[in-house]
């Protein structure tokens, strides 16, 4: 189904760029929000309008949803920067968008959160996301909550470790999940734009353990398989130490990563891109 007027917030991020490409390929009329005009090339002015605004500054968003049918927001941060907190971005910036959407009579708001965010509200990064999810569900607008597994781009950390010739894991490394490529996730979101008031939990086509991912990373760099398993108590101690002695800016992303890596996070499978191929492509870049 073609959606004629879509506002895309977060268009310059990993997922946002894939979404922009898919939306235009499907001949949607897209308004992309950017902080700087040169952040996105506009190869097709027939389908894309670029508007400069900052989602954390509501005065720059005034009437930005006028004439829009659907808002898609991928707005969120993993690491706090520029003096902005998770609450400033993941919650309040999306609330700013939601307020404009309601004012302009937008019919559908799509928000990209993360897998098991509702289960891990105690984590600072999820606290902000889930607070917005709650607000969106009670806003009166039709909504879609997308809960993807980890992105392929997040798996680069395994490649960085593999460059040294060894990957370090906490615990057994048998925890499983199915990361997803940005293009696959973008396609899934666009395919489901006609479905309202639902939550979509989604992952890539391959369910892999942390050991599997470590082996793929090492193999892609032609390294021997060397994986060191650290006691899980060290993971828990690391989280406690960081929460006790550092700011949320420091411990937030590490707490998020170490918590989710300690359990299975398996979502319904989708897509055609495989992590093995992605690692090979990225490894070729690292070798140059």
Task: Please identify what each model-predicted range represents.
Residues 153-160, 191-200, 223-225:
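Glycine/proline-rich active-site loop of Rossmann-fold NAD(P)-dependent oxidoreductases
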Residues 3-26:
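N-terminal Rossmann NAD(P)H-binding glycine-rich loop of SDR-like oxidoreductase domains
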Residues 15, 71, 185, 189, ...:
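Non-catalytic, hydrophobic alpha-helical segments
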Residues 171-192, 198:
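Substrate-positioning beta->alpha
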Residues 77-163:
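Glycine-/Pro-rich loop/turn segments that contact NAD(P) or position catalytic residues
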Residues 232-288:
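A hydrophobic C-terminal alpha-helical subdomain
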Residues 176-183, 202-220, 233-237, 273:
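Substrate-binding strand-loop-helix patch
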Residues 7, 38-96, 100-103, 116-118:
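NAD(P)H-binding glycine-rich loop region in Rossmannoid oxidoreductase-like domains
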